[in-house]
Amino acid sequence: MQFSKMHGLGNDFMVVDAVTQNVYFSPEMIRRLSDRHCGVGFDQLLVVEPPYDPELDFHYRIFNADGSEVAQCGNGARCFARFVRMKNLTNKRDIHVSTQTGRMVLTVTEDDSVRVNMGEPNFDPQQVLFRAARVEKTYIMRAAEQTVLCGVVSMGNPHCVIAVDSVDNAPVATLGPVLESHERFPERANIGFMQVLNRGHIRLRVYERGAGETQACGSGACAAVAVGISQGQLAEQVQVELTGGRLAISWRGPGHPLYMTGPATHIYDGFIHL
């Protein structure tokens, strides 16, 4: 099986063409491939499938390193867009794809950055898969014997965003996994720790559901900006500084889609016997 190794700001992926290749991945196989000592090593596996709808170009599937399938990965979406053009699966710059929960438009720019229409952020607890009686801008949670104030939003996957004074000292490794599997998130969640520098600039670290802390989380950056704007802390255009680099996020507010722009880097192509 042929594959490519790619990354988006250090969030790394194994990307596989299932349009011209016949492939199947069991959870056990994914866990084996994701091992950084005995396998390829990656945060997520991205699979390019033929479209389920003739109006679309491809179907986009995402698997975490633990073998679980998820509905969204923003950094992966950028790598997906560059991959299908690099492999001559399409020559379009505007690429329409379906995911487990919806549709996305991926636009490859002249400098090979990728702009992703992430859709409209959804703050409805039922859509976020968060146990709450009603929509709130800020929720109070008990976790790890402390009170946590957070915002929750779905970007196609569930996110919890916590404001911190400094991401350098944020309890990502301790509080992250506790909140990820908190009883109020029955399907688990991605946990973002956001430091607001000013209305147009934040720093962010994310503990990703099924993957742990990564160098960058695209949907997490989108979620943090959406929550920050909804709480009145941020402007419509925000630079998000992650461990692996920067993303540009823009959102005009309710009724409008949110856009993410950033790089996608090809590392190498490989072949593996399964």
UniProtKB/Swiss-Prot annotation:
The record marks Y268 as: Important for dimerization. This is Diaminopimelate epimerase. Catalyzes the stereoinversion of LL-2,6-diaminopimelate (L,L-DAP) to meso-diaminopimelate (meso-DAP), a precursor of L-lysine and an essential component of the bacterial peptidoglycan. Keywords: Amino-acid biosynthesis, Cytoplasm, Isomerase, Lysine biosynthesis. Its EC number is 5.1.1.7. Its main location: cytoplasm. InterPro entries: DAP_epimerase_AS, DAP_epimerase_DapF. One of its GO terms (molecular function) is diaminopimelate epimerase activity. One of its GO terms (cellular component) is cytosol. PROSITE patterns: DAP_EPIMERASE (PS01326). GO terms for biological process: lysine biosynthetic process via diaminopimelate. Pathway: Amino-acid biosynthesis; L-lysine biosynthesis via DAP pathway; DL-2,6-diaminopimelate from LL-2,6-diaminopimelate: step 1/1. The active site is at C73, C217. Homodimer. It catalyses: (2S,6S)-2,6-diaminopimelate = meso-2,6-diaminopimelate. It comes from the Bacteria. The record marks H159, E208 as: Could be important to modulate the pK values of the two catalytic cysteine residues. Substrate binds at N11, Q44, N64, G74, N75, N157, N190, E208, R209, G218, S219. Belongs to the diaminopimelate epimerase family. It is found in: Cytoplasm.
